[in-house]
């Protein structure tokens, strides 16, 4: 009787619990099998590694073997960004599992287990199960973690780009130096550093000029509008007032010229001006011409005086005047 009661009171797990336990037991074996199959297809040579650019193909290969996708759309974007950072990076299986856990936010085994479970359990049971709650919490974290991861990956990508640009410039510099002089130059390294610093300075100058242009044309529209208004006003004043100002100046000049001419004419026509004030003519100011003038003037005046005295004497003798 006691045995029957104990048997009747034994715990009997439900079907869903048995399914979950079965999934737990076969999860690691199944995920390993899927990864080995995908790895054997995409591995490079016999060294047992793949390139980072092969990760999306590995995930796609495993997705075809599962009832649902292994990753979400946001996971795919993060993986793509990480792959583009260094597509030729070599990865072993352990490194792949670490990268997958970092990028997706869950381990590879758990992701495979969740993808396999989605075809067996109903949505209600799946939502109430352990994996469903884990998937929901993982989805909640996906809204925060990928954004931070993307920022970190972008910063790392920019650093690698800067390093690549630096190495490319260094290579081009040494290549040009080798073409100029095949012999080894001791100060080549210093010359490259100086040229690189000059290039950085030029880039900074260009950035400053761009910022100035943005300040002039984009970031201070009020100042720009005010400056344009002042320039337009100056242009209108120049086109409208300048011709009138020139006409007024021309009229004033003509007025002063005519007034001066009239005054000069009046002063020259007056008769009450004494003779000693009048200005001598040009031939009177010449010494030679002035002497000739006075010579002939004296001779003429002497002849006139002598002739007049003879006429007076004859007149007196005729009329008996003594």
Curated annotation (Swiss-Prot):
<dbReference type="GO" id="GO:0005816">
    <property type="term" value="C:spindle pole body"/>
</dbReference>
<feature type="coiled-coil region">
    <location>
        <begin position="147"/>
        <end position="217"/>
    </location>
</feature>
<dbReference type="InterPro" id="IPR031433">
    <property type="entry name" value="Mps2"/>
</dbReference>
<dbReference type="GO" id="GO:0031965">
    <property type="term" value="C:nuclear membrane"/>
</dbReference>
<comment type="similarity">
    <text>Belongs to the MPS2 family.</text>
</comment>
<comment type="function">
    <text>Component of the spindle pole body (SPB) required for insertion of the nascent SPB into the nuclear envelope and for the proper execution of spindle pole body (SPB) duplication.</text>
</comment>
<keyword id="KW-0812">Transmembrane</keyword>
<keyword id="KW-0206">Cytoskeleton</keyword>
<keyword id="KW-1133">Transmembrane helix</keyword>
<keyword id="KW-0963">Cytoplasm</keyword>
<dbReference type="GO" id="GO:0005737">
    <property type="term" value="C:cytoplasm"/>
</dbReference>
<keyword id="KW-0472">Membrane</keyword>
<dbReference type="GO" id="GO:0071988">
    <property type="term" value="P:protein localization to spindle pole body"/>
</dbReference>
<keyword id="KW-0175">Coiled coil</keyword>
<keyword id="KW-0539">Nucleus</keyword>
<dbReference type="Pfam" id="PF17060">
    <property type="entry name" value="MPS2"/>
</dbReference>
<feature type="transmembrane region" description="Helical">
    <location>
        <begin position="245"/>
        <end position="265"/>
    </location>
</feature>
<protein>
    <recommendedName>
        <fullName>Monopolar spindle protein 2</fullName>
    </recommendedName>
</protein>
<dbReference type="GO" id="GO:0030474">
    <property type="term" value="P:spindle pole body duplication"/>
</dbReference>
């Amino acid at each position: 009787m006691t045995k029957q009661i104990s048997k009747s009171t034994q715990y009997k797990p439900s079907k869903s619990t048995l399914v979950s336990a079965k999934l737990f037991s076969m999860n690691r074996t199944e995920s390993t099998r899927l990864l080995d199959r995908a790895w054997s297809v995409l591995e490079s040579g016999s060294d047992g590694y793949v390139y980072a650019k092969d990760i999306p193909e590995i995930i796609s290969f495993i997705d075809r073997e599962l009832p649902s996708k292994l990753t979400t759309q946001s996971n795919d974007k993060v993986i793509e960004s990480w792959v583009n950072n260094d597509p030729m990076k070599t990865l072993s299986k352990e490194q792949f599992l670490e990268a997958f856990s970092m990028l997706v936010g869950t381990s590879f085994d758990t992701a495979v287990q969740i993808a396999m479970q989605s075809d067996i359990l109903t949505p209600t049971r799946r939502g109430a199960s352990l994996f469903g709650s884990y998937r929901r919490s993982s989805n909640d974290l996906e809204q925060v973690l990928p954004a931070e991861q993307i920022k970190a990956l972008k910063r790392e990508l920019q650093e690698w780009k800067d390093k690549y640009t630096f190495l490319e410039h260094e290579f081009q510099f040494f290549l040009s130096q080798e073409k100029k002089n095949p012999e080894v130059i001791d100060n080549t390294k210093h010359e490259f550093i100086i040229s690189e610093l000059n290039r950085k300075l030029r880039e900074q100058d260009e950035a400053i000029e761009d910022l100035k242009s943005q300040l002039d044309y984009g970031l201070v529209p009020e100042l720009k509008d005010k400056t344009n208004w002042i320039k337009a006003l100056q242009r209108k004043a120049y086109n409208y007032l300048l011709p009138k100002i020139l006409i007024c100046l021309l009229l004033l000049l003509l007025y002063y010229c005519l007034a001066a001419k009239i005054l000069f004419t009046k002063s020259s026509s007056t008769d009450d001006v004494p003779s000693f004030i009048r200005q001598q003519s040009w031939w009177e100011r010449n010494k030679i011409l002035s002497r000739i003038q006075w010579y002939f003037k004296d001779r003429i005046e002497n002849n006139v005086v002598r002739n007049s005295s003879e006429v007076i004497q004859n007149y007196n003798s005729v009329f008996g005047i003594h």
